[in-house]
Design a protein with these regions (language model features):
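Active-site helix of classical SDR
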Residues: 125, 161
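C-terminal substrate-recognition "lid" of short-chain dehydrogenase/reductases
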Residues: 222-251, 256
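Substrate-binding pocket helix/loop in short-chain dehydrogenase/reductase
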Residues: 101-114, 210, 214
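Short, small/polar-rich loop/turn modules that mediate ligand/substrate recognition or access, typified
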Residues: 177, 182, 244-246
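Residue(s) in the substrate-gating loop at a strand-loop-helix junction
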Residues: 145
Length: 257
């Protein structure tokens, strides 16, 4: 299916590895021009160079910066538009933050978990909406988690912030819909990639236990891949999903009940 992303400008926060990188590659494969951002300059530049070889340097723009910071986000989106033209799509993929199990979570860790997961998504969405709504066109995608769809025993800050992201998606969709700007969300399940949590689980001392758990809990009996999230993301961002907004889409191999 041709998704109609040729020449569209997509901004992806958290793009140097894993899910974010999978989304970038899917959008590039559909002909989009993609701005990629992440905090780690070295990893970001390595991926920019690799992707430029495959898709052309003229369709990539990279900026290392903290996508939790309002001014950094605003400046990055402004520079993206100066480089490529009007923003069509924005992907908020900044997430995770270390949090101990249980309820003994100090205020600093609690606040940091929400800043990392929820606030980063809100601030990028706001920056994108400021540009998209006057033009009457655009598509925003938040990357949440199935941890936000139910109590799965994840760290309190993570699951709670992701649940708030799911709600944010629906509220922003109602606000922006009359301006022809769509806001959707993907809730990934157990996605495996180099350096990620599930790679550590699948290769660590409890790898056999985790393998049994996956077979028991996931009807497709396996982990997902960044490419599979990328495929769903490219569709949701694209004009082909023109009647989808406010949707929280699990991509989890059937794990959520």
């Amino acid at each position: 299916m041709h998704l109609g992303l040729d020449g569209k400008v997509i901004f992806v926060a958290g793009a140097s590895r894993g899910i974010g990188l999978g989304i970038v590659e899917a959008c590039l494969a559909e002909g989009a021009k993609v701005a990629i951002t992440a905090r780690g300059a070295e990893a970001l530049e390595a991926e920019r160079a690799r992707l430029a070889e495959a898709y052309g340097a003229d369709r990539l723009w990279a900026l290392a910066g903290d996508m939790r910071d309002t001014q950094v986000i605003e400046d990055a989106v402004t520079r993206c538009e100066a480089e490529f033209g009007p923003l069509f799509g924005a992907v908020a993929n900044v997430g995770l933050y270390p949090c101990p199990p249980g309820f003994e979570v100090d205020d600093e860790t609690w606040d940091a978990g929400f800043t990392q997961n929820l606030d980063s998504a809100w601030r990028l969405s706001r920056a994108a909406l400021r540009r998209m709504t006057p033009r009457g066109d655009g598509s925003i995608l938040l990357i949440s988690s199935i941890a936000g769809l139910g109590a799965l025993g994840t760290a309190l800050t993570y699951g709670t912030a992701k649940a708030a992201m799911n709600h944010l998606t629906k509220e922003l969709a109602r606000i922006a819909g009359s301006k022809n700007v769509r806001v959707n969300c993907i809730a990934p399940g157990n996605i495996i990639f180099p350096g990620g949590t599930w790679e550590a689980n699948s290769t660590g001392p409890r790898a056999d236990n985790w393998a049994r758990w996956i077979r028991r809990e996931v009807p497709l009996n396996r982990y997902g891949s960044p490419e599979e999230i990328g495929a769903a993301a490219a569709f949701l961002l694209s004009p082909k999903a023109s009647f989808m907004t406010g949707a929280v889409v699990p991509v989890d191999g059937g794990q959520t009940r």
